[in-house]
């Protein structure tokens, strides 16, 4: 006879679902639940057959003090479908914790982590057993849809071990988080988790009719662009990587360097052949090069994003993006990872961050597809030069800090332009400019790449770098670019020192830390020259997460009929009711919460007026000045 423990009596409980598939937002649902307790007890319950077990779970799970599992949000979504509710504010995910402990793993599956840290394994022979029963390859991907058809005894053996390993992994992680002093960043991820889960659950409304129309619009653009490419070439060109592109640009070699026929230096593949990838096409002056890039972009937007990611995932007028807080396993499969190592949120299904905010042509086609909740309006705010302001905080040059103190709304590129005498943005003919060198400093661009992007002289060199067995080619800045960089360092003291200090720390101890204590590691001492830039980016990502929490918690408390929608790059979007001055007052309070960071330089954001869709919201004038 089944035992039903009092789950609220335990400090933590591992709870794992067995489901008919992975699409909780469609028709898949749980058919079995396994638990594991700190006292060593574990059990599996087939809730299709055992009504008492289901009723016990429905009445008990919400009382669990701390529910733990691997990819916990998946189980939370699945259990909610059968009216079993997990407390999302206390639930803990071993997958998120694993990425805080080490962001460089090749796999974040439970099996992989159990082998690495616990010297234990899941029950893998279930795939062979299922293949014998139902046919098909003996892989997780092929056999997962057959789990609900498997004998209960087989599922019990498999599911209990999963719950037991998740609990053991959580217990090991408790000590490791303390050892690495990761408590602050883990608290941030815990605070964020309920908002991620709620955003996924409700989803984002989509204009399906407009999405289909956009496919037709993009097809016309692609066809027109291809015709123009073919006219310029004098023959038919396949815009995808192909021999016809090589024929069009006729690369030739002088010494060790490849050039396009217009004289543009281009890279070399590992096989020693000319590289005509995106970087080369951006540099080549022939008008067909830019059109090929445009054609590829439009094909990707049409086929991959709108047809695949959006229309392929609509359920009842909504898409339910998978939001990655950290790195994790890909789509519930064990075959790879997704997410970022710096902590920045990423979205899949659809990959919303792939809609380029600065590419107005694509944004104008795609963003109108996304709508606020029925009867509401979309509002949008974008942090002003967020990473550059964090960069200024760390570098702490007096001249820059004083300029921001005098006018918090200053444009950093213009500040640097005034200090160095450079133009703010790149002249049409190329050359040194403040915006490009700021980008280089924040993102640790090499001097040669900076020279290339500013159309200043550089050379190709070959060297073998630490930790690498084979030599590789790199761009080396010429004297003119080096002089520009030196001028920048003199005008803004502290920048070079912070970069050197971060690189030194990365080399000596193997990691650097963000303001929230997130560790960014450098295995084998590789790429330590990127350390300072990764600190800026990681700190910006942590602040973005804090901002989501501040906004979402304010909405829950003060205006629960509004809803936080998404965070892409440094943007925040909400679905709101137009209540005139009341809405503006709420937006001003959200602005205050976001800007209150206590840095040496002010953080700035303004929210715009309400609009019928995402794209129109980005064009609205600010109402929170």
Swiss-Prot record:
InterPro entries: 3'-5'_exonuclease_dom, DNA-dir_DNA_pol_A_palm_dom, DNA/RNA_pol_sf, DNA_polymerase_A, RNaseH-like_sf, RNaseH_sf. PANTHER family: DNA POLYMERASE I, DNA POLYMERASE NU. Belongs to the DNA polymerase type-A family. DpoZ subfamily. Keywords: DNA replication, Viral DNA replication. SMART domains: POLAc (SM00482). It catalyses: DNA(n) + a 2'-deoxyribonucleoside 5'-triphosphate = DNA(n+1) + diphosphate; dZTP + DNA(n) = DNA(n)-Z + diphosphate. This is DNA polymerase DpoZ. GO terms for biological process: DNA-templated DNA replication; double-strand break repair; viral DNA genome replication. GO terms for molecular function: 3'-5' exonuclease activity; DNA binding; DNA-directed DNA polymerase activity. Residues 324-345 are annotated as: Disordered. The keyword Protein biosynthesis does not apply. DNA polymerase that preferentially incorporates the non-canonical base aminoadenine/dZTP instead of adenine into the synthesized DNA. More efficient in using dZTP instead of dATP as a substrate. In addition to this preference for dZTP, the phage also encodes a dATP triphosphohydrolase that removes dATP and its precursor dADP from the nucleotide pool of the host. It holds the Pfam family DNA_pol_A.
């Amino acid at each position: 006879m089944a035992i039903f423990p009092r789950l609220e009596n335990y400090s933590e409980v591992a709870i794992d679902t067995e489901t008919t598939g992975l699409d909780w937002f469609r028709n898949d649902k749980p058919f079995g639940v396994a638990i594991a307790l700190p006292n060593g007890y574990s059990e599996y319950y087939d809730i299709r057959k055992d009504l008492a077990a289901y009723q016990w779970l429905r009445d008990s799970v919400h009382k669990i003090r701390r529910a733990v599992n691997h990819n916990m949000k998946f189980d939370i979504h699945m259990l909610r479908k059968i009216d079993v509710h997990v407390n999302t504010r206390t639930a803990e995910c071993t997958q998120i914790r694993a990425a805080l402990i080490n962001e460089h793993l090749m796999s974040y599956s439970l099996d992989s982590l159990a082998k690495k840290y616990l010297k234990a394994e899941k029950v893998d022979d279930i795939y062979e057993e299922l293949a014998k029963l139902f046919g098909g390859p003996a892989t997780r991907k092929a056999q997962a849809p057959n789990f609900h058809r498997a004998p209960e005894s087989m599922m019990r053996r498999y599911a209990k071990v999963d719950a037991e390993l998740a609990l053991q992994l959580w217990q090991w992680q408790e000590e490791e988080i303390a050892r690495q002093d990761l408590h602050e960043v883990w608290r941030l991820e815990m605070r964020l988790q309920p908002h991620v889960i709620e955003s996924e659950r409700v989803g984002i409304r989509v204009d399906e009719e407009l999405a289909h129309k956009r496919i037709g619009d993009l097809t016309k653009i692609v066809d027109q662009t291809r015709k123009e490419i073919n006219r310029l070439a004098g023959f038919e060109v396949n815009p995808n990587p192909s021999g016809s592109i090589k024929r069009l640009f006729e690369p030739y070699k002088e010494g060790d360097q490849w050039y396009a026929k217009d004289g543009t230096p281009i890279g070399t593949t590992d096989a020693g052949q000319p590289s005509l990838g995106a970087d080369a096409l951006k540099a080549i002056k022939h008008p067909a090069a830019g059109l090929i890039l445009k054609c590829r972009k439009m094909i990707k937007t049409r086929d991959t994003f709108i047809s695949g990611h959006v229309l392929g995932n609509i359920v009842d007028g909504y898409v339910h993006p998978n939001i990655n807080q950290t790195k994790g396993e890909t789509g519930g499969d064990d075959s790879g990872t997704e997410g970022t190592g710096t902590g920045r949120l990423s979205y899949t299904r659809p990959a919303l961050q792939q809609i380029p905010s600065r590419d107005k042509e694509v944004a104008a086609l795609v963003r109108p597809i996304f709508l606020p909740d029925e009867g509401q309006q979309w509002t949008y705010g974008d942090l002003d030069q967020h990473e550059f302001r964090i960069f200024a905080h760390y570098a702490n040059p007096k001249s820059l800090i004083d300029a921001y103190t005098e006018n918090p709304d200053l444009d950093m590129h213009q500040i640097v332009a005034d200090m160095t005498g450079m133009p703010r943005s790149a002249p049409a003919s190329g050359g040194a400019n403040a915006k490009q060198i700021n980008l280089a400093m924040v993102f640790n661009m090499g001097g040669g790449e900076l020279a290339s992007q500013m159309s200043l002289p550089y050379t190709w060199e070959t060297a073998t770098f630490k930790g690498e067995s084979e030599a590789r080619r790199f761009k080396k800045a010429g004297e003119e670019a080096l002089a520009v960089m030196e001028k920048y360092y003199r005008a803004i003291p502290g920048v070079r020192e912070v970069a050197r200090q971060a690189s030194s720390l990365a080399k000596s101890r193997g990691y650097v830390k963000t303001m929230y204590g997130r560790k960014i590691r450098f295995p084998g001492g590789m790429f330590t020259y990127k350390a300072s830039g990764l600190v800026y980016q990681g700190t910006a990502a942590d602040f973005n997460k804090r901002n989501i929490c501040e906004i979402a918690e304010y909405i829950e408390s003060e205006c629960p009929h509004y809803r936080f929608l998404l965070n892409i790059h440094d943007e925040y979007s909400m679905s709101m009711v137009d209540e005139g001055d009341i809405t503006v007052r709420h937006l001003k309070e959200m602005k205050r919460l976001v800007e209150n960071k206590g840095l040496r330089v002010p953080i700035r954001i303004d929210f715009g007026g309400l609009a019928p869709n995402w794209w129109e919201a980005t064009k609205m004038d600010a109402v929170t000045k």
